[in-house]
A protein has these predicted regions:
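C-terminal and inter-domain tail/linker signature
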Residues: 1-330
Length: 330
């Protein structure tokens, strides 16, 4: 009878775990005029990015500034990974990012795994996940070379205006670079380390979606999943086992395929299935950051393109570190 009562109470609580509808984008104080681009314009924007990056990585330091100015505005604003962080202007871009990268990896190649585009509010954007591969032959970011092949996981979002990129967000997984360079400096990952694989059942680069409703539906599915994360059973005084069951039966469940893969950055790792995601990352993360706000800042990017969607915050999360459950640090 007590077990039956527990199940009834559990189902009763689930009825009230409704996904709240709210704006997930950046909080803005000025009126802006939304832009919408056609599928053909979106395809051309993606080709513009692919072709120019292919030229830059092909020629490397040969005519570098000229090649960069074919795609980037001279006053480009760059938001980068630690320790490069934020800076402006094409000369800073060359000095801080491109020259050190090409010096350290003289044969570096770029392989796109996913590239998608769209518009969000008043911004036209193209985003990608790519792998930058090359022999590590000279120091990079203060790390001595190990003279081995390195695969850098790289995620980018570029804002395009007047046929030039005016702002870029570039995140290279530096912790994974350290791992491959034999410089592991943190606790072991809960998940599995290694490459992030390309899409399993579709081409993530050379696709063209004419039906804008499909792209919008892909984005809305992702945003609904994002909003579901604001439901926080860890705020209640419950056991770890009960929290696990609550997360497995959380409203997020409606948005994940049974064989889903969650690719986390190095230090966290990759997990398979919702149960694996809960065990390897979500449950310990929620216990460590029970006091957190996903939406105090909001997304600067929300785009859908065919089967794919892309959201991003800069920065994404404000939280209080409350326990060592997640990565084991006091």
């Amino acid at each position: 009878q007590s077990y039956s009562c527990y199940l009834s109470l559990f189902k009763y609580k689930l009825q009230f775990m409704q996904i709240e509808q709210f704006d997930t984008g950046l909080k803005i104080k000025k009126n802006i005029e939304d832009v919408e681009i056609t599928p053909i314009q979106n395809l051309n924007n993606k080709k513009f990015v692919i072709e120019n990056f292919r030229n830059i990585y092909g020629l490397k330091k040969i005519n570098l500034k000229k090649n960069l100015l074919n795609i980037f505005d001279k006053d480009i604003k760059v938001n980068c990974f630690e320790p490069l962080n934020e800076f402006n202007g094409i000369d800073n871009f060359i000095e801080k990012f491109w020259n050190p990268l090409f010096d350290a990896f003289p044969d570096i190649e770029r392989r796109e795994n996913i590239i998608l585009g769209g518009s969000f509010r008043d911004k036209v954007q193209v985003g990608s996940y790519s792998t930058l591969s090359g022999f590590f032959l000279k120091p990079w970011l203060g790390i001595k070379p190990n003279f081995k092949m390195i695969n850098l996981k790289c995620c980018e979002i570029h804002e395009i205006k007047n046929e030039r990129i005016i702002e870029s967000h570039i995140l290279i997984d530096v912790m994974d670079f350290l791992r491959q360079a034999d410089k592991w400096v943190i606790n072991p990952s809960r998940g599995s380390e290694g490459a992030w694989l390309p899409p399993f059942n579709t081409d993530g680069v050379n696709f063209f979606e004419e039906d804008m409703s499909k792209s919008k539906n892909s984005l809305q599915q992702a945003l609904s999943m994002n909003r579901s994360l604001d439901i926080k059973p860890e705020k209640e005084n419950i056991s770890k086992d009960e929290l696990r069951q609550r997360l497995i039966n959380h409203p997020q469940k409606e948005f994940w395929h049974k064989d889903m893969i969650w690719y986390g950055p190095c230090g966290i790792g990759t997990s398979r299935s919702l149960e694996g995601f809960v065990d390897m990352h979500q449950l310990p993360f929620r216990k460590s950051f029970s006091e957190r706000n996903y939406w105090e800042l909001g997304h600067y990017c929300e785009i859908g393109d065919g089967k794919f969607s892309l959201c991003g915050g800069w920065h994404s999360l404000k939280a209080k570190y409350g326990s060592n459950d997640w990565l084991g640090y006091t």
